[in-house]
A protein has these predicted regions:
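Cytochrome P450
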Residues: 1-407
Length: 407
């Protein structure tokens, strides 16, 4: 059968049933309501699997809308490859990928084993003093002011400073790092994205060469001197590993803690509960992670198959929005509420062979933020007459969050 064009002018492959076609860009769809997570949850009223021919950046893709289907695909690395998850190699014209993120089993395991010692619970525990010091340093700048613009004053800086310390990078470079990272992840201009990716690559290559001559007891030296099955990593393997840390360290946690503080500022009862019962903060962190999945990763179908009664063809892309799994009412009671006692599984940090290596670090960072803010400030809120702002291109993020509080 031949492909057809739908009324919006998009080409629909012949194997896609017309009733599964959804003519929207999911990021624009998310902006139709005051809360993008509630907005995209409207997709739960339709099929469990839809096809979007005109989604972000012109990449037609399947979109699973339910937790179970998303979880099943995450767990099936054989039929759903992660090799073109982000596709930096295509933009740069290089033969290496972000690893282990874009490496399929079994090869990915060697790369995970290089990084795992630096992110396991015992290693994160050793970092706690540094993480809390960074948080307190930033809070001290506005603690007596009665309020702040949370994104610029804290959320963008806190996880970034932690990341810079982990990799031994200078804070003075942070404005440039932000510019490259934001352009690469969020710009609709492909030329600008390519230029940003090249800027990141060139800087990191120079830095890694300098660090070869300056070994330290840290993560970068650990990567530079690592071996897999008795052989050292080559240049591309090292670059792929450091670049995946760059993107994860500068954006994902920073974007996430904006949503968490926004939620807290709108939920006075949750503030009181956590302040009076700080032992519940880890549970709150888990359910905030569940409720606010900010990333939609990508998989590529490796063979013709049928799922949810629909044919998928080898080479089809699948968008994996954590925010659709997060708010699935089939999986969670009252999914839009954050409940520290929920104790429910989620896929915000992915699952299966590509579950997030930095999960323990991210959870500890988030917990420290909640601990330090709740210990200092009462009745954290968005001031009357002010509004928060957010965006849904790339990693979903709060871009402005004015806060005031009582002492």
């Amino acid at each position: 059968m031949a492909s057809t064009a739908d009324p919006a002018g998009f080409i629909i492959p012949a194997h896609v049933p017309p009733e599964r076609v959804w003519n929207h860009d999911i990021n624009a769809f998310a902006r139709e309501l005051d809360d993008p997570f509630v907005a995209t949850a409207r997709l739960h009223d339709g099929p469990d699997l839809i096809y979007s021919p005109g989604t972000a950046r012109g990449n037609p893709c399947w979109i699973p809308t339910r937790y179970k289907l998303l979880n099943d695909i995450f767990m099936d690395a054989k039929r759903f490859s992660s090799e073109q998850n982000i596709g930096v190699n295509l933009l740069l014209g290089v033969d290496w990928r972000l690893n282990p993120l874009e490496i399929d089993p079994p090869a990915h395991m060697g790369y995970r084993q290089v990084l795992q010692p630096w992110f396991q619970p015992s290693a994160v525990k050793e970092l706690e003093g540094m993480i809390r010091r960074v948080a307190c340093e930033l809070i001290a700048a506005f603690e007596e002011e009665g309020g702040c613009e949370y994104v610029d004053a804290f959320a963008s800086l806190f996880p970034s400073y932690v990341f810079l310390e982990l990799l031994g990078l200078p804070r003075s470079m942070l404005p440039q790092f932000f510019e490259w990272e934001h352009t690469f992840i969020r710009s609709p201009d492909m030329g600008a994205r390519i230029a940003a990716a090249r800027g990141i690559k060139d800087y990191l290559e120079t830095y890694l060469e300098e660090r070869r001559d300056d070994p330290r007891d840290d993560l970068v030296t650990g990567i530079l001197t690592a071996q897999i099955k008795g052989r050292p990593l080559d240049h591309g393997e090292i670059m792929g590993m450091v670049m995946v840390l760059y993107f994860g360290g500068l954006d994902t946690v920073a974007s996430s803690i904006g949503w968490y503080m926004r939620h807290l500022a709108k939920d006075r009862a949750l503030q009181v509960r956590l302040r009076e019962n700080p032992e519940e903060i880890p549970g709150a962190v888990d359910d905030m992670l569940r409720a606010y999945g900010v990333v939609a990763t990508r998989r590529t179908v490796t063979e013709d198959l049928t799922i949810d009664g629909v044919e998928m063809r080898k080479g089809d892309f699948v968008l994996m929005p954590g925010y659709l799994a997060s708010r699935d009412p089939r999986q969670y009671d009252d999914p839009h509420m954050v409940d520290p006692a929920r104790k429910a599984r989620h896929v915000t940090l992915a699952t299966g062979v590509h579950n997030c290596l930095g999960a323990h670090l991210a959870k500890r960072e988030i917990a420290i933020v909640l601990e330090e803010f709740l210990a200092r400030f009462d009745n954290i809120r968005i001031p009357e007459g002010e509004q928060d702002e957010w965006q849904t291109e790339g990693v979903w993020a709060v871009t402005r969050l004015p806060l005031v509080w009582d002492r």
